[in-house]
């Protein structure tokens, strides 16, 4: 079976090797693209393909990547990395202080990122031993960048989980909840009170669109007639997440392969795999900093699937084309 991080990677590496051989594409430039969990997958595949199949890639593209090495920590760093996403979402819903709201999003986010790295993370690291005046000061700034009430932030000890944010941000602005995968979407629950939305409102819209489309395509365009259900979301359980070394394996693959470059694409309004977590993952792949010129990062005013917004569909595709043109070897020898 391939229900696990490492078994999934091994299975897909074997499949890719067979495909490349059968289609006689060994001399072709090779790129992997993975979205969400696929980000973990392609990080691991880059190393597996090189070391088990001697297949060297030109590029790895991670779209809204999930980094379970980060998610499983549950520490101060993980918590703090949510704030710039909160800022972007609050800006979209006109929930920020007037001084911030009148600015462009791209001008606000560096301020939120700086506060997160240099003030919020150290404050959370101190836990219950933080000075009370410092705690209040951090809460005030957190409120400024998130649109959340200072008292609410203090009641959560400066550590506001994302599900609380989705429920709380618009509680006093119509009692709406906001989406997880795309926080531009609004919904409402039976009760305005509570700590978690009843459902992911964006999925109701997407499932309503994608399910008829894929079923029509399979039956009418591909002429694949079946009574089997197409699972837009599938119960793939249990999934073995043990021994996840994919982030470091990408570093090893890049160290072995001077031509391997990485592009990361993220949506500002994605609350599942938020853009600042993706940026942090990029920073941590190679702590030495010797390969930082081989990383590219692009963000978009969209959610988890940035290509659902027409402007970002065009821009994200153009960014991939530019990345490919920058990462072609053009006959250079593979050496440092």
Stretch-by-stretch model annotation:
Residues 62, 297-303:
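Short glycine-rich catalytic loops that host catalytic nucleophiles or stabilize transition states
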Residues 44, 260, 274-284:
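Short alpha-helix in the alpha/beta-hydrolase fold that links the catalytic acid
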Residues 127-272:
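Alpha/beta-hydrolase fold catalytic core
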Residues 25-37:
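Alpha/beta-hydrolase fold nucleophile elbow
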Residues 46, 50-143:
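A catalytic-pocket lid/entrance helix-loop region that shapes and gates access to the active site
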Residues 1-22:
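Cap/lid segment of the alpha/beta-hydrolase catalytic domain
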Residues 301-312:
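Catalytic histidine-centered segment of alpha/beta-hydrolase-like enzymes
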Residues 34-47:
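Glycine-rich nucleophile elbow surrounding the catalytic serine of serine-hydrolase chemistry
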């Amino acid at each position: 079976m391939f229900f696990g991080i490492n078994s999934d990677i091994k299975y897909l590496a074997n499949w890719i090797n067979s495909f490349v051989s059968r289609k006689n594409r060994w001399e072709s430039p090779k790129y992997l693209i993975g979205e969400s969990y696929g980000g973990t997958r392609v990080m691991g595949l880059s190393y597996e393909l090189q070391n088990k199949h001697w297949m060297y890639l030109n590029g790895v593209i991670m779209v809204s990547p999930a980094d379970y090495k980060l998610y499983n920590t549950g520490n101060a760093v993980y918590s703090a990395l949510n704030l710039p996403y909160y800022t972007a979402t609050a800006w979209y819903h006109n929930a920020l202080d007037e001084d911030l709201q009148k600015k462009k999003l791209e001008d606000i986010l560096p301020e939120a990122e700086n506060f997160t790295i240099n003030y919020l993370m150290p404050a959370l690291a101190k836990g219950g031993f933080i000075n009370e005046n410092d705690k209040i000061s951090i809460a005030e700034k957190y409120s400024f960048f998130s649109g959340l009430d200072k008292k609410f932030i203090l009641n959560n000890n400066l550590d506001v989980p994302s599900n609380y944010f989705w429920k709380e941000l618009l509680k006093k602005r119509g009692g709406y909840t906001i989406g997880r995968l795309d926080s531009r979407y609004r919904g409402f629950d039976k009760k305005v009170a509570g700590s978690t939305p009843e459902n992911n409102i964006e999925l109701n819209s997407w499932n309503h669109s994608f399910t008829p489309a894929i079923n029509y395509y399979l039956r009418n365009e591909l002429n694949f007639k079946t009574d089997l259900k197409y699972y837009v979301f599938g119960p793939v359980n249990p999934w073995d997440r043990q021994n996840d070394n994919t982030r470091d394996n990408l570093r090893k693959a890049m160290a072995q392969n001077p031509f391997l470059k990485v592009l990361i694409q993220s949506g500002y309004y994605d609350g599942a795999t938020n853009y600042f977590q993706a940026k942090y993952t990029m920073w941590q792949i190679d702590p030495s900093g010797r390969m930082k010129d081989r990383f590219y990062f692009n963000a978009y005013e969209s959610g988890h699937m940035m290509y659902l917004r027409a402007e970002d569909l065009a821009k994200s595709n153009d960014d991939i084309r530019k990345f490919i043109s920058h990462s072609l070897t053009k006959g250079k020898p593979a050496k440092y």
